[in-house]
Regions:
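Flavin-dependent oxidoreductase catalytic cores
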Residues: 1-184
Length: 184
């Protein structure tokens, strides 16, 4: 809404702005069939999107019967929404509470410990998507399974530690762009 200033069939109303997304999904299904799993990532509270709009797109995606998973990039699964009218609810609760039938819900956002992963799964997510935790600990899922109190390494992490975790020099270089991620 805020960022899309188009005046053609892809701008203005939510229907128009969502049109490319639904056309792409329809094309993927047509070309790949039902045995091909399709997931869609949605990012509330980013890029001018409002929670009500994201919830509407989410519900429409489920209603199409053409997707298998919705991946909500929440940036911080534990925080309350910042948008007026939603600020008394956690983002995870806002989206886990939507009827999704057989569509799986994946969530990402500061899942740095086994406790945080348990929390989002307990709140209704089907899949916990870990990013930084898996970068700093390549075996994060196994470590969580073996130790219910496991948490990722403290940041910043020495570059050599990242290399020891399997990151290439190119990837370590990329991670240096993330403020406070690489120590040296």
């Amino acid at each position: 809404a805020e960022l899309n200033r188009r005046t053609d069939e892809f701008g203005g109303s939510l229907d128009n702005r969502a049109r490319p997304l639904f056309a792409i999904i329809e094309g993927i299904r047509r070309e790949c069939g039902n045995d091909f799993h399709v997931g869609v990532r949605l990012s509330p509270e980013r890029f001018g999107m409002k929670i009500d709009e994201i919830r509407e797109v989410y519900s429409r995606l489920v209603a199409t019967g053409q997707i298998d998973m919705i991946d909500m990039s929440l940036w911080d699964c534990a925080k309350n929404a910042i948008e007026e009218g939603w600020a008394d609810r956690r983002l995870i609760d806002i989206f886990a509470g939507i009827d999704r039938g057989t569509v799986r819900l994946a969530v990402a956002g500061k899942l740095y410990s086994a406790a945080a992963v348990r929390e989002v799964l307990g709140a209704g997510a089907d899949i916990a998507v870990v990013g930084r935790a898996a970068i700093t600990n390549h075996d994060f899922p196994r470590m969580m399974r073996d130790n219910p109190d496991f948490a990722m390494r403290e940041l910043p992490v020495p570059a050599q530690t990242l290399r020891d975790e399997g990151l290439s020099d190119t990837f370590v270089g990329y991670m240096r762009n993330w403020k406070g991620f690489v120590a040296d």
